[in-house]
Amino acid sequence: MDTVSAFKLEVRADKIAVITIDAPGEKMNTLKAEFGNQVRGLIRQVRDDKSVRGVVFISAKTDNFIAGADINMIARCRSAQEAEALARQGQQIMAEIHGLSIPVIAAIHGACLGGGLELALACHGRICSDDEKTRLGLPEVQLGLLPGSGGTQRLPRLIGVSTALDMMLTGRQLRARQALKAGLVDEVVPQAILLQAAVELALKGRPASRDMPVRERVLAGPLGRHLLFHFVGKQTQRKTQGNYPAVKRILQVVENGLAHGCSSGYAEEARAFGELAMTPQSQALRSIFFASTDLKKDRGAEAEPGPLTSIAVLGGGLMGGGIAYVTACKGGLPVRIKDIQPRGINHALKYSWDLLNKQVRQRRLRPSERDRQMAMISGATDYQGFAHRDVVIEAVFEDLALKQRMVSEVEQYCGPQTIFASNTSSLPIGDIAAQARRPGRVIGLHFFSPVEKMPLVEVIPHKGTDPQAIATVVQLAKRQGKTPIVVADKAGFYVNRILAPYINEAMRLLVEGEPVEEIDKALVKFGFPVGPIQLLDEVGIDTGTKIIPVLESAFGERFSSPANIIDAILKDDRKGRKNNRGFYLYETKGRKSKKRPDPAVYPLLGIDRPQSRLSAQQVAERCVMMMLNEAARCFDEQIIRSARDGDIGAVFGIGFPPFLGGPFRYMDTIGAGEVAAILQRLAAQYGPRFTPCDTLLRMAEQGTTFWPADERLT
């Protein structure tokens, strides 16, 4: 049976060949291996028809040009040689497109990423729509890879090496106007005339080569290139701690091509692509990609979600303001904020205004669009306008009686269909619902701070929550741009429960005399974005430690903080960055706030002279092993539904190193037996809190894993 082609050729009356990209049965266009022959066949037809004056590539999809290559192709490769051959095939197809003697133009609307941008780079000209959906980028580094179809060679020659490196090393995506300014596209036009404009560009002949700015010409020369790559190499090493081999290989491949020419660069690119595809880091990063993609299809319960037409938020504080913003500005849903004080409503409105206005200043948003989005948020000090709200998200103080009163009031002023979603971080949802008339409509929806930045939410049904309420809240979280995981209604839920022992162990290391900055450096070296002590400062020491007594009450001694360390810090009015006094001191210089460890912390904790006695590896081992042990307990107690959810929760919720794939994939990689052995060694050295849980001991004995065997390979 023949595969339905994703590429359709039509020659217009003006002799411009339009190749329409439309992957059959797929929402997104992605490049698959079998498309290679289809493209080659069309290129051959164009080449053989001497009357054709130009070619335009355009997508039939409503919101994407080509979103990248199909990652499953890489997962199916069983050796570096197979992956290298895949890259060479991509390079050859792009070379055939670029080799056409007539103008080839890419007409881009929507996502143009990875292999999609590499195809556009192989064209002689690029024109894109001015739509907000239009994004151009090479995000392969986020999968532990590099662009493998010529992108490492074509992009630096088109826009300059420094801008190209920034895009490839970070995966940063450019909007239409940014792409125009960078020289990545030749024109930006309204979507309605995109095809017409691309045809006109093709009829003009090949676009002239862009004059590179003087700075980029200098950086492309031998001396400038040497200085640039030396500087960027040091900078990326500091940021990645050597944990992401793709970063180093991108630098090597780009430099090789600039120094020795395109042919050498293409060969090195394909070889590096093959090597990187087989690294454990890429396999782990791809597993996160597959897991998060899988979660997008997960409804959370065996039920259809209810309607989502309007939402309400109780509380205009930091969390309430952030929740209102993502609901209205990301989710496109009208929001009504209720606060007992007008200043609370004003605070929440200002929160959204400031975020939107920042986008206007950065020219990412038009003032008219800012005003339209702000008009979707309203406020009141009473329940006016609440009657028909589908979901009411509660973001008031962590006080059980107060939250129960909120449930009662919402049931009084809202319809029977309204779902009450509590943004609690510590209180059992079953307790909040205990006095409800409609307990089936009560659920937990735990956001992380700052709401607009943190991608994860925990959805927490209690035993009596309706399946439809679960599905509706999961759908709402997705509308808000979040990745939701459904977790059980037990103390700490999942993320805070695995985070607390990690933080507590860092505090114990501090009490033992390890310097604040050395503890943080050790965990950053391990792969966390920030260390545990800095994390406490960022979240707020008062906020971040509220959960610990709750966990200690529920699970006992293993959650107790050492020697009242937190009490001593809080009594000295140290709340972290929010009052510029925590374990670090913060000085505002220019736009950025610089931090330095505060030596006054040590006497507060009874520490005479802090001194590093342990290696970075030993410090990291103690903190991380406490987290892994607790994660295994959560798995056994079915706090999470699967290893997939546990890995996504840890990576998206607390920054567990993505290149390790999450705590469960990491434990599977090193083996339950090895994890248990390390914990037993630490227990002998430091005490019973490190005793491996029964789950790990059982898995070690049976040789089993958290992830099913067939899912561990992706």
Curated annotation (Swiss-Prot):
GO terms for biological process: fatty acid beta-oxidation. Residues 306-714 are annotated as: 3-hydroxyacyl-CoA dehydrogenase. The record marks 118, 140 as: Important for catalytic activity. The keyword NAD applies. It is found in: Cytoplasm. Pathway: Lipid metabolism; fatty acid beta-oxidation. Heterotetramer of two alpha chains (FadJ) and two beta chains (FadI). In the N-terminal section; belongs to the enoyl-CoA hydratase/isomerase family. This is Fatty acid oxidation complex subunit alpha.
